Amino acid sequence: MGYSVEEIRKDFEQLKEGNIYLDTAATALKPNVVINAIKEYYIKFNGNSHSKMSIYGDKTSELIENTRNIIARYINSNKRNIIFTKSATESLNTCIFGIEDIVKEDDEILLTILEHHANIVPYQILSKEKNIKIKYVYLKEDYSFDYNDFEKKINYNTKIIGITMQSNVTGEEIDIEKICEIVKKRSKELNIEIPYLIIDASQGITHKKIDVRKLDTIYALVFSGHKIYGPQGVRNIIYII
């Protein structure tokens, strides 16, 4: 099925004059339907969510829960596992520092060199506070992800794994279903508990469908609402299994 670029342009005020926008990986432009929905909210509702003090609060609560249902269907999850935050950094910090008590001295965190700083700095803080080691998975000579290196670096001390679904620098896509299988296989071989696997899907979800029911070894998955044409106010979604 074909599509018309000109018809798509009509949905975005910034593109009607012929502009070309190449920074969607940072944040997507907002189509008119999103802008109109925000405008309608402030004109008609604008109440505190989950407040029974007014009909506006009820309507706002309904809108939020409907959105939660939509997101849950989008990634094939239970809506009770969906949490909204205001930024990618907050989402990852919530996941990482929420499990800081499970790590102890000499434990290890496994990251990749493809990670965004938001998925590195919290671990560096944790490493310094808890005296734990951070290991990195490197790339092959052709800059593709090295799954063999990833598998080898999971060991008896690995407690947390942080990994991007797609690099915001190189565009390299990591097969997160394959990652889950490797983690499961390696954990069984070593007879250890499955490490806490946190996936940053902020870039990847814009290019590939995610079914969290196929990712049965993950602890959490984070992605950005504003990169998939949602408003800036609700930036990130955390799926916690």
Cite the ranges covered by each PLM segment.
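Pyridoxal 5′-phosphate
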Residues: 1-241
